[in-house]
Design a protein with these regions (language model features):
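Bacterial N-terminal signal peptides that target proteins for export
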Residues: 4-14
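Active-site-adjacent loops and short helices of periplasmic peptidoglycan-processing enzymes
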Residues: 24-171, 180-181
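Ser/Thr-glycine-rich phosphate-binding loops at phosphate-binding pockets of nucleotides
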Residues: 59, 253-254
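Bacterial N-terminal signal peptides
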Residues: 14-22
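N-terminal start-of-chain detector that recognizes signal peptides
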Residues: 8-9, 55-57, 83-86, 203-207, ...
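Domain-terminus/edge residues, biased toward the C-terminal soluble/receptor-binding domains
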Residues: 150-154, 162-167, 171-252
């Protein structure tokens, strides 16, 4: 009974967190949405505009990572596989690692750069090395989305950089987040990493919630001007996991 009570309190706190975050933000962003689900049962504990389409920003990289993990799982690549950097990838706007054209980056470093730094150049590197072009990789991402049950999502790039046709919903991102944790539990542990070092430079996580909320262990933050700040996150208490997604914050509350 005590554990059930503690879990009820946990659910209440998570739901309250989402309510406070959404309804204390500025009205400068019309599209606000959120969803909280129980990981084990997939029960929706709270939702607001969960099916409203919005720009995913860097939450896009969750799918880029999902596909990368899938390739690793199928032994099509290894953590030591070197990915070549093209001129197009090197030219991507920040956030980025400032990779140089013609250089390479190992898969294991690319994974951490996407999780911690949210590097747009690395996202394009992954896309081009898997599918030849980022356009083709985006088609692959959308195909994966449909197979996972993400019916309202269309990807146009691997990074989340602005594209009016790249759209998703809070519900779809919760489905993706659940699938990533379920299908790649060992890889998901990497999302709890708070910093990583690449070529002598240390990068720290953008996800401040992991530093302040007990039990939080991921997942991803995002921002573009057109949509505001976004967050997909997961937390565990008393061996119970919840997943939450927020869209359309006008400032970082976490």
């Amino acid at each position: 009974m005590l554990m059930e009570h503690d879990m009820s309190v946990f659910k209440f706190l998570i739901t309250s967190f989402f309510l406070i975050v959404i309804f204390t933000t500025s009205q400068s962003y019309a599209k606000k949405a959120a969803i909280v689900i129980d990981f084990d049962t997939k029960e929706v504990l709270f939702e607001v505009n969960a099916n409203t389409k919005n720009y995913p920003a860097s939450l896009t990289k969750i799918m880029t990572l999902y596909i990368l993990f899938d390739r690793l799982e199928k032994n099509q690549i290894t953590n030591q596989t070197k990915l070549k950097v093209s001129r197009i990838a090197a030219s991507r706007s920040p956030s980025k690692l400032y990779l140089e054209e013609g250089s390479t980056i190992k898969v294991e470093d690319a994974i951490m750069a996407l999780i911690i730094k949210s590097a747009n150049d690395v996202a394009t590197v992954v896309a081009e090395n898997i599918s030849g072009t980022e356009k083709e990789f985006a088609k692959l991402m959308t195909s994966y989305a449909r197979n996972l049950g993400m019916t309202n999502t269309t990807f146009k790039n691997a990074s989340g950089l602005p594209n009016r046709a790249q759209l998703t919903t809070a519900r779809d991102i919760s489905i993706l987040s659940h699938s990533l944790i379920s299908n790649f539990p060992e890889q998901y542990k990497l999302f709890n990493t708070q910093k990583f070092t690449y070529k002598g430079k240390t990068y720290k996580t953008h996800n401040k919630l992991m530093l302040s909320y007990e039990g939080a262990d991921g997942i991803k933050t995002g921002y573009i001007r057109a949509s505001g700040f976004q967050l997909a996150f997961s937390a565990v208490r008393n061996n119970k996991r919840l997943i939450g997604v927020i869209f359309g914050l006008s400032l970082i509350h976490i």
